[in-house]
């Protein structure tokens, strides 16, 4: 019986000529004349046992592929050009991709030009980016590859500080490519992380590129109001899904989001004031009643900072209150702050550089009803007066942007909405062009390069250019609350001495 001789790494395999001539694969068609010669056909880059497995497949149309031998069989199948075995191997590898091997499979797919495996391994890296940073192969990704991964809209990061830690870990292994840090969007990075990056001698350029990482964009919590029961839903820009979280039977409440929990504060139930605070976890949808506030009140102002929920002012029956207090997330004790200089309800409060600013609202007693324009700032454990707003406003929405405060006013006694900018360092107010008029509730939050306003439609206001964009949407009887990530960077005064400890803590929190 005539045979064709193959030599692999010095080992000889004799193959029946009939198997070679019956093969439909191009590689064997090209060597069918070699059986007349005595010399062996040398095969380079192929494993001996993998070639045996391919011969078994040619004989019996069966092959034993496992996670342990799949790579060597796949390499042999690619070189020998046996498409059915290539497909079987690729399916096996894709089925077994996980966060511990996805970078190795990613590199393998590039080396041999396997598009399906490339796409599958890239998807696994994108979905498990924080976990794969522990892989020794992570630092060997090229600058362009990591840029592509971190620029993908579905990359699984939920805070730009997490992106920063991923980049810092990669830069540690690739110190000649520090300019990759410029894929960060500074507006989404906390001051603490910015300081740490600066102490490392790195400079982040102001980004002019659009934000592609959906996970760092603001999630939205929506409360659709009715006369009795309001429905709470949560929208994730990353998944593009709306999820019903639960319901509340309160009116005249305030709400805010802290550590992925929505807090419903005060208000009225069946026309009775309440001092209870409810909290719903937006991931598990579980409700919990937290410690009561110091008094019964509705129409309070709230803001969050450094893991704490601040509740300021409000209406105690028919009298405005100046009580200010805060609750640290996960604790059960309210801490009182000094009272406001002027009691008020329905005002706005916002943090700028760890100072609280409170503005507008209504001061009322049994005899008085005064719409306010005054502004107070809580700094160094006391309230101080600041320059008043240009006009008196009972409904005020405020947001911090680039170290200053932007205020949009509602309509009650006023004839139209106003837009103001408060320059914090100069203690100065200026009036800006207001694009629309809307009677009813609004939502305002800072979203990177613009301020989002939801009223009768969705508006984007760009402070740097003083321009507006308009998007139609149905917003009747809906309130919107900003959603913050639970992965908050440890807040501290980062110095050269404390920098290693800070980065170590962030790595443990974000990347493990």
Swiss-Prot record:
The keyword Repeat applies. Kelch repeats lie at residues 216-261, 262-307, 309-354, 356-403, 405-449, 452-498. It comes from the Viruses. Gene3D superfamilies: 1.25.40.420, Kelch-type beta propeller, Potassium Channel Kv1.1, Chain A. The keyword Repeat applies. Keywords: Kelch repeat, Repeat. Residues 2-67 form the BTB domain. Residues 102-176 form the BACK domain. Pfam families: BACK, BTB, Kelch_1. PANTHER family: KELCH PROTEIN, KELCH-LIKE PROTEIN 8. Belongs to the poxviruses Kelch family. This is Kelch repeat protein C2. It comes from Rabbitpox virus (strain Utrecht) (RPV).
């Amino acid at each position: 019986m005539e045979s064709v001789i193959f030599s692999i790494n010095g080992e000889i395999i004799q193959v029946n000529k009939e198997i070679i001539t019956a093969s439909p694969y191009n590689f064997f068609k090209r060597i069918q004349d070699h059986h007349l010669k005595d010399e062996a056909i040398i095969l380079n880059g192929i494993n001996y046992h993998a070639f045996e497995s391919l011969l078994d497949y040619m004989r019996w149309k069966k092959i034993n592929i496992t996670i342990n031998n799949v790579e060597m069989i796949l390499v042999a199948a690619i070189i020998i050009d046996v498409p059915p075995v290539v497909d079987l191997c690729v399916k096996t590898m894709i089925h077994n991709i996980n966060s511990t091997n996805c970078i190795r499979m990613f590199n393998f797919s590039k080396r041999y030009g396997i598009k399906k495996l490339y796409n599958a391994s890239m998807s696994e890296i994108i979905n498990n980016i924080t976990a794969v940073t522990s892989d020794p192969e992570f630092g060997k990704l090229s600058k362009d590859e990591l840029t592509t991964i971190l620029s993908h809209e579905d990359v699984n990061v939920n805070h730009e500080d997490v992106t920063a830690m991923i980049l810092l870990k990669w830069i540690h292994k690739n110190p000649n490519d520090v300019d990759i840090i410029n894929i960060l969007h500074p507006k989404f990075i906390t001051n603490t992380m910015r300081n740490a990056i600066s102490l490392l001698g790195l400079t982040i350029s102001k980004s002019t590129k659009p934000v592609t990482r959906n996970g760092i964009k603001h999630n939205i919590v929506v409360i659709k109001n009715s006369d009795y029961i309001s429905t709470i839903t949560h929208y994730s820009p990353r998944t593009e899904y709306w999820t019903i979280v639960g319901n509340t039977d309160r009116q005249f409440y305030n709400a805010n989001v802290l550590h992925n929990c929505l807090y419903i504060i005060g208000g009225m139930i069946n026309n009775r004031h309440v001092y209870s605070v409810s909290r719903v976890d937006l991931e598990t949808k579980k409700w919990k009643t937290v410690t009561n506030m110091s008094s019964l009140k509705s129409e309070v102002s709230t803001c969050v900072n450094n893991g704490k929920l601040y509740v300021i002012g409000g209406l105690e029956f028919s009298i405005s209150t100046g009580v200010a207090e805060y609750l640290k997330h996960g604790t059960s004790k309210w801490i009182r702050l000094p009272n406001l200089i002027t009691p008020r309800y329905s005002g706005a409060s916002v943090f700028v550089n760890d100072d609280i600013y409170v503005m507008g609202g209504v001061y009322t007693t049994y005899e008085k009803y005064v719409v306010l324009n005054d502004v107070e700032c809580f700094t160094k454990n006391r309230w101080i007066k600041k320059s008043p707003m240009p006009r008196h406003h009972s409904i005020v929405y405020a947001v911090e942007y680039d170290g200053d405060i932007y205020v949009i006013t509602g309509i009650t006694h006023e004839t139209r909405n106003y837009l103001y900018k408060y320059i914090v360092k100069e203690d100065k107010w200026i009036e800006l062009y207001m694009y629309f008029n809307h009677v009813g509730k609004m939502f305002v939050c800072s979203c990177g390069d613009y301020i989002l306003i939801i009223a009768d439609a969705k508006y984007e206001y760009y402070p740097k250019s003083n321009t507006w964009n308009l998007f139609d949407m149905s917003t009747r009887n809906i309130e919107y609350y900003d959603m913050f990530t639970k992965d908050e960077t440890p807040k501290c005064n980062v110095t050269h001495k404390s920098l290693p400890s800070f980065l170590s803590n962030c790595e443990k929190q974000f990347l493990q």
